[in-house]
Amino acid sequence: MSKSLEWDNLGFSLLPWIRTGLDVMGFETMTPVQASTIPMLAGNKDVVVDSVTGSGKTAAFVIPVLEKVVKEEANTSKFKKAHFHSLIIAPTRELSRQIESVVLSFLEHYPSDLFPIKCQLLVGTNEATVRDDVSNFLRNRPQILIGTPGRVLDFLQMPAVKTSACSMVVMDEADRLLDMSFIKDTEKILRLLPKQRRTGLFSATMRSAGSDIFKTGLRNPVRITVNSKNQAPSSLKLNYCVVNPAEKLQLLVSILNNYKFKKCIVYFPTCVSVSYFYSFIQYLGKRNILVNEVEIFSLHGKLQTSARTKTLTAFTDSLSNSVLFTTDVAARGIDIPDVDLVIQLDPPTNTDMFMHRCGRTGRANRVGKAITFLNEGREEDFIPFMQVKNVELEELDLEVKGITTNFYEDFRNWILEDRDRFDKGVKAYVAFIKYYSNHSATSIFRLQSLDYVGIAKLYGLFRLPRMPEITKYLATEKQEGIFPGNWLVDPPVNMDEYKYKDKKREKERQETLKNISLINDKKKLKSELKKKNLAWSDKTLTKERKLERKEKMSLKRKAIEEELKAEELDENAEEERIKEDWKEIVLQNKRKKVSSKAIQGNFDDL
């Protein structure tokens, strides 16, 4: 690393227009990762860069890419059509767009009299197909491609696209690109590219990729690790707060009311919980329970790409105090200026994602604060667990302030206004249980230790839903705060009279109720008839059994009589045969006597 972090001490002279871009963007000096990486990557070295979040990694690879495009004359008319010079891959559309914006920020200062340098974004959208991307590529002839693995792979496999001129590949958030979600696409992409190329891998959690980095075709790579006692930059303050899960939402509103911030990002565990709590917080804003006038935004992975882009742009460009409710879709690599507060309602299932979330604030030496809510009990072991990973968290003693109304009564009344809200609350609750069961740190985040009732109250449920985890939970021991039928309120809510605001849905519900009522009436009638006819049916059954026995006895008697008759006939026949035999014997004896007399007379004659 250079002794000085001045740009003049980089080891080579940056192109004048790149230097102008740095000045305009406010990069007065290099960060340690930039000072270490730029000379290596710009000078024919493969690099594996592991540096804390918010340390300027994007500029550390964008500058070498632009330098090489010029140095290798890819910015001339000699550069072949249907070829490209550099490929930058990122795991999400949002991060890809952000990298594109950094590249374009530098290109704004590119001399207009030179052959233009262009970049093209390759991300899946409903607005453009892969064929559209290829058409734009052939028409505009960009030297730099930026995109997500799936779309990049589809693009490179098109016959019209040539890959032989590609001399540099950069993988941002490389550990993510090498995990199970993307590894197949990433490997296929790299097989389509020339082996003689420069490769750069960048991430704040590069260590988690392990030996998978060697699947990227690195040749004698230089490993750059910006050492730090703490994974968080010094400008980022990491805090945690141990709280009863039922009070999390109220504490969140209290923080939004009492903390001074320009922009705040609140991380929720699931997409459905984002949209659910977003609706309620908007309701609180209308009722002036949110003291500070803040603009609330919602962003999650189930939204259409165009909606996500629009929301992220609106939040980034907002001049008023703003809060973004989101999931991990906005956790990696995204650089939003002026974010000075991050709140996590629950820790992420992947512990590596923890620092990526926190790292949305405290970037580029700006002051930032990240607060994580932990449930009381076993989850408190998360603190020493993160210490092993060089992440130090300081406990914050927070109290609910500035909420004069009965918060949970307001929450319940809001839910009772529309049955659809209750349905979404149940879905959010079930999704959270599944989310929690997939946690990587299973020794800390265990379903057996989860406060199911407290979580249910957080999501505004009136009763616990039917699911295997709840059945198991209730079977272990008698739980407090649960009334018969798994109700959490007494008296229970009359679900038959609980209506949807949407007239169409309510009409469907009423029809369903009628059908259920008819079915129940039929079952009831059948049951009553069964009871009424029980004595009669018993008598009939007894008569039938008697007749059956009589028939059996009659058949048996008949069979015995026939057998006796047969035996009698056999005896008579035997007597007749004996008589005949005696007659035959008598006749034979008579014949013998006659014969002997005849013989005797003849001898006398001699």
Swiss-Prot record:
Compartments where located: Nucleus, Nucleolus
The Helicase C-terminal domain, residue ranges: 248-404
EC number(s) from the headed UniProt entry: 3.6.4.13
InterPro entries: CTT_SPB4, DEAD/DEAH_box_helicase_dom, Helicase_ATP-bd, Helicase_C-like, P-loop_NTPase, RNA-helicase_DEAD-box_CS, RNA_helicase_DEAD_Q_motif, SPB4-like_CTE
Binding site for ATP: S51, V52, T53, G54, S55, G56, K57, T58
CDD domains listed in its UniProt record: DEADc_DDX55, SF2_C_DEAD
GO biological process terms held by the UniProt record: assembly of large subunit precursor of preribosome; maturation of LSU-rRNA; ribosomal large subunit assembly
SMART domains noted in UniProt: DEXDc (SM00487), DUF4217 (SM01178), HELICc (SM00490)
GO annotation, cellular component aspect: 90S preribosome; nucleolus; nucleoplasm; preribosome, large subunit precursor
PROSITE patterns in the cross-refs: DEAD_ATP_HELICASE, HELICASE_ATP_BIND_1, HELICASE_CTER, Q_MOTIF
Coiled-coil parts of chain: 539-582
Keywords on record: ATP-binding, Coiled coil, Helicase, Hydrolase, Nucleotide-binding, Nucleus, Phosphoprotein, Ribosome biogenesis, RNA-binding, rRNA processing
Gene Ontology molecular function: ATP binding; ATP hydrolysis activity; RNA binding; RNA helicase activity
Signal peptide range: none
Motif (DEAD box): 172-175
Catalytic function, reaction form: ATP + H2O = ADP + phosphate + H(+)
Family stated for the protein in its record: Belongs to the DEAD box helicase family. DDX55/SPB4 subfamily.
Function: ATP-binding RNA helicase involved in the biogenesis of 60S ribosomal subunits. Binds 90S pre-ribosomal particles and dissociates from pre-60S ribosomal particles after processing of 27SB pre-rRNA. Required for the normal formation of 18S rRNA through the processing of pre-rRNAs at sites A0, A1 and A2, and the normal formation of 25S and 5.8S rRNAs through the processing of pre-rRNAs at sites C1 and C2. Also required for recruitment of NOG2 to pre-ribosomes.
More details: Present with 5740 molecules/cell in log phase SD medium.
Entry remark concerning the domains of this protein: The Q motif is unique to and characteristic of the DEAD box family of RNA helicases and controls ATP binding and hydrolysis.
Name of the molecule in the record: ATP-dependent rRNA helicase SPB4
